[in-house]
């Protein structure tokens, strides 16, 4: 995809709109908006991003105008059949022009007047070149067609402005990975795993875990800000493994990395790198890392990495699975060479697992930083309660410190479940014993009752912790032996 293609697609969309083929114009406009979105993700310069965002807004405004025209025309079509008798009676001065148009060679094939009226806007491509014949469908519809014409004229002056903005924005080709040949489908599949939309999770949305956030900033953010410092022995970390029980915020940390760090972010799972065809899974792994180096700086997030690269040499291991693991290990070892000389071209693998003891030893060595994501501390539990309850009305008797004390041993996901259950208690009390019709007629104010301390105590009795003490002991033992914080 090049800037020339974007420009041509914009021209094509406007030509369709001017000729009255609005459905095709909308399709072209949508394609242009998607192309600009993809290009925006590859732009690193903030001023350049603002210009392209302005271009996107203007193109989007044109699309809305074309949609409004389509809606107006559809309403005309719906009204055309019932309004026909009254139009003969009231619009006598317009009908002679309509009859003259029927004698035109281009429209003589039409079987009836209502059919021609309903299709008039779709025939402009064939009628347009005949000069005087083109405006006749608008005259046939009376004055309703005039605002439509003025909208098309308004779009025309904006065209030079759009082209000027595009020319000033960037004059280079759009950066896109392309190896051609039979790998194109595999590349397209991997490109779908590039997160182009903001997950909207910031560091402040994650309670506690200060050490983990500090390490991730050091591994991803600081090398971008201080490339001269992170060289040689101080090169950026090429692999980080997050270990911990379920529901402690490992995936949430990855979302924060995608939001806060201006790097290309690949979200990869076992389904992404698995194929039923022999040799294709290894090829997907190789292409993933080639694309990562091409779009560098890049972060590859592999969730539940134990499902992809479990321990080799076991009796349950399949030969195809072993080949995929070998390719992944080879590619990860090759990642470091691309970032040692230029930290801005780094590729970092960020992995998460609930079963660190099942991971292959060679992969454990390549994931240089192995950090423990523990259950929330007392302060972390209070912070989590504040984050989860910030949109709720709380009664005066709610004591968050006391609630946090009763939640010792709960994971972050468990605390969220308690808050969700407590927030529904008032609604459950209000609708108890009511019929469905009475529930539908309840005022909204009565549904938004403050959440009380009693609601939290009831929710705590219903929601138990999901992590056992034996599991915590296993994690702590593993991190004490293999951890690298």
Curated annotation (Swiss-Prot):
Alphabetically ordered keywords of this record: ATP-binding, Cell cycle, Cell division, Cytoplasm, Cytoskeleton, Isomerase, Microtubule, Mitosis, Nucleotide-binding
Listed Basic and acidic residues bias regions: 141-173
Name of the featured protein: Katanin p60 ATPase-containing subunit A1
UniProt source species: Danio rerio
EC id: 5.6.1.1
Enzyme class, broadest EC rank: isomerase
Highest taxon of the lineage: Eukaryota
Subcellular location(s) per record: Cytoplasm; Cytoplasm, Cytoskeleton, Microtubule organizing center, Centrosome; Cytoplasm, Cytoskeleton, Spindle pole; Cytoplasm, Cytoskeleton, Spindle
Assembly notes: Can homooligomerize into hexameric rings, which may be promoted by interaction with microtubules. Interacts with katnb1, which may serve as a targeting subunit.
Family the entry assigns: Belongs to the AAA ATPase family. Katanin p60 subunit A1 subfamily.
Catalyzed chemical reaction(s): n ATP + n H2O + a microtubule = n ADP + n phosphate + (n+1) alpha/beta tubulin heterodimers
UniProt GO molecular function: ATP binding; ATP hydrolysis activity; microtubule binding; microtubule severing ATPase activity
Record-listed ATP binding positions: 244-251
Region: Disordered, residue numbers: 101-173
Statement: the UniProt record of this protein carries the keyword ATP-binding: yes
Activity regulation details: ATPase activity is stimulated by microtubules, which promote homooligomerization. ATP-dependent microtubule severing is stimulated by interaction with katnb1.
């Amino acid at each position: 995809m090049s800037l020339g293609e974007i420009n041509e697609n914009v021209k094509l969309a406007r030509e369709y709109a001017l000729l009255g083929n609005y459905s095709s114009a909308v399709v072209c406009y949508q394609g242009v908006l998607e192309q600009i979105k993809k290009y925006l993700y590859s732009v690193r310069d903030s001023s350049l991003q603002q210009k392209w965002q302005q271009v996107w807004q203007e193109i989007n405004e044109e699309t809305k105008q074309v949609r409004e025209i389509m809606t107006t025309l559809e309403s005309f079509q719906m009204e055309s059949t019932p309004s026909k008798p009254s139009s003969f009676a009231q619009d006598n001065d317009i009908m002679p022009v309509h009859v003259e148009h029927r004698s035109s060679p281009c429209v003589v094939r039409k079987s009836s007047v209502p059919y021609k009226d309903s299709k008039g806007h779709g025939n402009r491509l064939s009628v347009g070149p005949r000069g005087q014949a083109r405006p006749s469908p608008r005259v046939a519809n009376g004055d309703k067609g005039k605002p439509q014409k003025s909208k098309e004229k308004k779009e025309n002056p904006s065209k030079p402005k759009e082209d000027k903005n595009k020319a000033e924005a960037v004059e280079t080709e759009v950066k896109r990975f392309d190896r051609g040949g039979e790998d194109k489908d595999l590349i397209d599949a991997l490109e779908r795993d590039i997160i182009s939309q903001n997950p909207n999770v910031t560091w402040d949305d994650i309670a506690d875990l200060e050490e983990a956030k500090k390490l991730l900033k050091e591994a991803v953010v600081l090398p971008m800000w201080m490339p001269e410092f992170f060289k040689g022995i101080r090169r950026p970390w090429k692999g980080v493994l997050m270990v911990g029980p379920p529901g402690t915020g490992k995936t949430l940390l990855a979302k924060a990395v995608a939001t806060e760090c201006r790097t290309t972010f690949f979200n990869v799972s076992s389904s992404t790198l698995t194929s039923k065809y022999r040799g294709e899974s290894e090829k997907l792994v190789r292409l993933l890392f080639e694309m990562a180096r091409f779009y560098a700086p890049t972060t590859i997030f592999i969730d539940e990495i134990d499902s992809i690269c479990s321990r080799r040499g076991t009796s349950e291991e399949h030969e195809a699975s072993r080949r995929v693991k070998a390719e992944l290990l080879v590619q990860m070892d090759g990642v470091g060479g691309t970032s040692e000389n230029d930290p801005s071209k780094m590729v970092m693998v960020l992995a998460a697992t609930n079963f660190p003891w099942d991971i292959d030893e060679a992969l454990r060595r390549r994931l240089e930083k192995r950090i423990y994501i523990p259950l929330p501390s007392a302060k972390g539990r209070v912070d989590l309660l504040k984050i989860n309850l910030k949109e709720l009305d709380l009664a005066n008797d709610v004591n968050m410190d006391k609630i946090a004390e009763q939640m010792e041993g709960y994971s972050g996901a468990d605390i969220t479940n308690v808050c969700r259950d407590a927030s529904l208690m008032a609604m459950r009390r209000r609708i108890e014993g009511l019929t469905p019709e009475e529930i539908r007629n309840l005022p909204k104010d009565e549904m938004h009752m403050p959440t009380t301390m009693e609601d939290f105590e009831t929710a705590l009795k219903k929601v138990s912790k999901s992590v056992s003490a034996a599991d915590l002991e296993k994690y702590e033992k593993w991190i004490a032996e293999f951890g690298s914080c």
